[in-house]
């Protein structure tokens, strides 16, 4: 499917669209599962309205065998649907993990220390975990709510109205859950990221912290950050858990209300005894997806926020375009009026440097600490992009080279060697 002119396609959206056939399969299985969910209601209706009045054992045996077969089919379909959703999450991860890892590596070279660290990888885990959970199944089941309500109305108008009122209450609770859980969940995830960044920074600088006696103060700062995270996570969990508990209670109240309405109709000879049980089972099933959606709403909110962060990140750092295939450099290094600003900074620390170095020659760069020697070297090997000017090898600018190809011809030893440490 081609994108419309002027419309920018999302990499996340493309990865999800690649699973379109799997989602269609999940939708078809959800259709069959929800039709099979009618088995219990119809079974009870037949038991009370046919088997008991006729006292027919063969009819009872036939109904039990038929219902058992339908329940087995429903269980198998539910199992397959769950496994397909797990594989959709895995497929999305496989399509994006290399790209997300690339952004984790490249982002510090663009924004310096003010980056998201490993958060993009955690975001991808959040999206995959939600897609692999029971949450998406609940959303696939929600569109079948009107069918169940229509059957309740077919039993009797009062039963249908009772189920409809319960549905309105639970859907309202779902909307309230969305508005009340969005901010606490976002706050909790931000606090978790800050806590993890502080722990990672402390680990990288362990020698300095111990040598200068700062480990106690950093531990105190981390404990304060952790307490804020725990408090925020508790608020988010309280909102989701509280509304989820209310939803469960309301579903049980609704089930009892349907039983009471059914009993009233039987007493007034407006319905049969089977309608009491069948209506109760059907109304409970109608609202089960709403109940399940509320229970998984916290995970949905977290996955949605992770999705938005990943989308912004991948748009900020587009994928590398295949560079021009060039011959191995062998003649000359040219630096043309290069000025350098460190990533995430505004101050120029190397300005208008120009020199040429032919093959076989060497050059030493000396100067006081902080004068920009390391910054110049980072630009010479392509780690940092110059603010102005060009660095060329055999006439080709460094950004025309593939880093994988160029790296074979460059030796680079940074001040802090931490690779695979």
Question: Predicted segments — roles?
Answer:
Residues 16-18, 109-110, 123-131, 135, ...:
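An intracellular "coupling" helix at the cytosolic face of ABC transporter transmembrane type-1 domains
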Residues 30, 63-70, 137-187, 260-271, ...:
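Transmembrane helices of ABC transporter permease
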Residues 26, 44, 102-147, 204:
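Juxtamembrane loop-to-helix connectors within ABC transporter transmembrane domains
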Residues 2-9, 86-129, 196-197, 212-232, ...:
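Extended non-transmembrane interhelical loops and adjacent amphipathic helices
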Residues 86, 214, 238, 286-313, ...:
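Cytosolic ends of transmembrane helices, especially the final helix of ABC transmembrane type-1 domains
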Residues 1-38, 53, 57-61, 81, ...:
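Membrane-integrated ABC transporters
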């Amino acid at each position: 499917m081609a994108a419309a002119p002027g419309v920018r396609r999302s990499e996340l959206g493309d990865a999800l669209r690649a699973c379109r056939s799997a989602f269609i399969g999940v939708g078809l299985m959800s259709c069959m599962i929800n039709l099979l969910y009618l088995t219990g209601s119809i079974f009870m209706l037949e038991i009370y309205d046919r088997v008991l009045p006729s006292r027919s054992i063969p009819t009872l045996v036939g109904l039990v065998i038929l219902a058992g077969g339908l329940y087995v089919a429903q269980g198998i379909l539910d199992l397959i649907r769950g496994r397909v959703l797990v594989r959709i999450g895995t497929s999305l991860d496989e399509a994006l993990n290399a790209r997300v890892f690339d952004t984790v590596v490249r982002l510090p070279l663009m924004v310096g220390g003010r980056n998201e660290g490993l958060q993009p990888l955690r975001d991808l885990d959040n999206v995959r975990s939600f897609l692999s959970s029971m949450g998406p199944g609940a959303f696939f089941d929600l569109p079948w709510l009107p069918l169940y309500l229509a059957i309740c109305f077919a039993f009797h108008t009062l039963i249908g109205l009772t189920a409809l009122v319960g549905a309105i209450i639970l859907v309202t609770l779902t909307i309230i859950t969305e508005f009340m859980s969005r901010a606490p969940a976002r706050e909790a995830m931000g606090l978790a990221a800050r806590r993890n960044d502080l722990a990672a920074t402390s680990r990288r600088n362990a020698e300095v912290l111990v040598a200068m006696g700062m480990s106690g103060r950093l531990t105190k700062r981390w404990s304060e950050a952790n307490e804020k995270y725990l408090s925020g996570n508790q608020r988010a969990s309280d909102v989701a858990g509280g509304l989820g508990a209310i939803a469960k209670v309301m579903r049980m109240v609704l089930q009892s209300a349907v039983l009471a309405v059914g009993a009233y109709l039987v007493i007034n000879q407006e319905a049969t005894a089977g309608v009491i049980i069948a209506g109760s089972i059907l109304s409970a099933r109608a609202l089960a997806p709403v109940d399940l959606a509320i229970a998984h709403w916290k995970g949905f909110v977290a996955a949605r926020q992770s999705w938005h962060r990943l989308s912004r990140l991948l748009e900020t750092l587009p994928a590398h375009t295949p560079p021009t295939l060039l011959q191995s450099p062998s003649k000359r290094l040219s630096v043309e009026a290069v000025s350098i600003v460190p990533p995430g900074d505004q101050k120029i620390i190397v300005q208008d440097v120009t020199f040429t170095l032919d093959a076989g020659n060497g050059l030493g760069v000396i100067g006081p600490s902080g004068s920009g020697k390391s910054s110049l070297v980072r630009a010479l090997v392509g780690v940092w992009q110059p603010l102005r000017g060009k660095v060329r090898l055999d006439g080709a600018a460094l950004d025309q080279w593939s880093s994988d190809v160029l790296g074979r011809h460059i030796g680079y030893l940074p001040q802090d060697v931490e690779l695979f440490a």
